[in-house]
């Protein structure tokens, strides 16, 4: 049985709260000032959390905005699942910090760069190298601790 939209939104809010509680230090290791420039990592991290917490595999979506789309210029990444747009780094553009909606105002208006399911086996090396240290810093702040993503 699929989770409800409200359950997906609650999990996204939990994860964003954990990112905020972990503070800026984990992101500084990646030369990122969250949320600016963190959308790709944040989407991948949230995708793995949603898989473990709710059993859903969301798609990572990356698009380029050739023009200004509501403050978004250049590249942005977020998740999509079952018709939902899920974004936990929109505040870098002046949007809400957590967006979970079936009617996105800005998402989907750019040019598709890439789209793929999160947490794919062939991405494991990249994920642990790029997202592993962030996951380790964020995990203690999650209401449902997840010990193993393997």
Regions found by a protein language model. Give the residues of each.
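A structural boundary/capping signal
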Residues: 1-150
């Amino acid at each position: 049985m699929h989770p409800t939209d409200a359950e997906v939104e609650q999990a996204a809010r939990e994860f964003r709260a954990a990112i905020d509680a972990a503070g800026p230090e984990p992101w500084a290791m990646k030369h990122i000032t969250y949320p600016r420039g963190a959308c790709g990592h944040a989407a991948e991290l949230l995708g793995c959390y949603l898989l473990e917490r709710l059993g859903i595999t969301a798609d990572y979506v990356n698009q380029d905005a050739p023009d200004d789309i509501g403050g978004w210029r250049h590249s942005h990444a977020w998740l999509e699942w079952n018709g939902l747009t899920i974004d936990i780094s929109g505040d870098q553009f002046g949007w809400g910090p957590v967006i979970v909606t079936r009617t996105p105002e800005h998402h989907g208006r750019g040019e598709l760069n890439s789209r793929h399911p999160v947490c794919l086996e062939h991405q494991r090396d990249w994920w642990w190298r790029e997202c592993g240290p962030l996951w380790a810093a964020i995990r203690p702040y999650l209401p449902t601790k997840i010990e193993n993503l393997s």
